[in-house]
Amino acid sequence: MEYRFNTPLNGNIAMTYHYHEDAALRRDKSLYKFVWVQSGTLDIEVDHVVMHLEKDEIISLTPLHHVEVKRVEGEYLTFLFNSNFYCIYGHDKEVSCNGFLFHGSSHIMRLQLSAAQSEQLKSIIDIFAGEFGIKDNLQEEMLRIILKRFIITYTRIAREKLDVGQDKEKSFDIIRRYYAVSYTHL
């Protein structure tokens, strides 16, 4: 399964099970990424640190991360998009490109999904794949909405897994703002 959509303003979104084989996607340093192991295992190097991911583990990565797939034993999904497609300033700070999933921690957001959580995200992926078959002037906005739904659902799962309440929210917000300022001035 391979889906790509490009907007007239250089917005890009893609979903693939073959990221490691796609030189164009690997070369594109503007992409935010969700890497989700659907079966088997995946060894992926992020910023020169090898991570061993197993079934239903998911990570979120920014364009600043250097990513190299080392070993694939099974199937994994990579969901990618750039800031021209989604990251406009109007998005809520928690589900934006400067939000919780990408800049909410000093570590890479890595979660083990339960079967129910995996099904939640899979249903969104199925809707996304179905939308690629509909070629009309509403497709771009629908893909953006589906991406936002994926991000919101994943954010809720992460907040629950990490037990983020009001007391921890300030710490995450400070980290998020630090990354936003750093990214702006680099």
Label each PLM-derived region with a short phrase.
Residues E54-H66:
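Conserved metal-binding segment of the jelly-roll/cupin
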Residues M1-E57, E73:
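Generic protein-terminus/edge-of-domain signal
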